[in-house]
A protein has these predicted regions:
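Structured alpha-helical
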Residues: 1-82
């Protein structure tokens, strides 16, 4: 059953998973207005919430929806208010 709100487009861009103590390079496999599929080493160690840096776009706060080996499915969230 398809649960996506918006269709994803294959993009194959480089991005960065920004964490409080480090940054991990990733490949953005596909992208929509509401989420993305990412490939990166150490995907199992990425916390459930993080900031994704995509070239030519503002940073986006993400929540992991699924994990499979070196891949993550994320949905975009509002940045938390501090």
């Amino acid at each position: 059953m398809e649960r996506r709100v918006a269709a994803r487009t294959r993009v194959l861009k480089r991005g960065t998973v920004e964490l409080p103590e480090s940054a991990l390079p990733c490949k953005i496999i596909d992208l929509s207005d509401t989420g993305a599929r990412l490939a990166l080493s150490g995907a199992n160690h990425v916390p459930n919430f993080f900031t994704l840096l995509i070239p030519d776009r503002p940073p986006v706060f993400c929540q992991i929806i699924w994990r499979r080996q070196e891949r993550l499915g994320v949905t975009f969230r509002e940045l938390p208010v501090l």
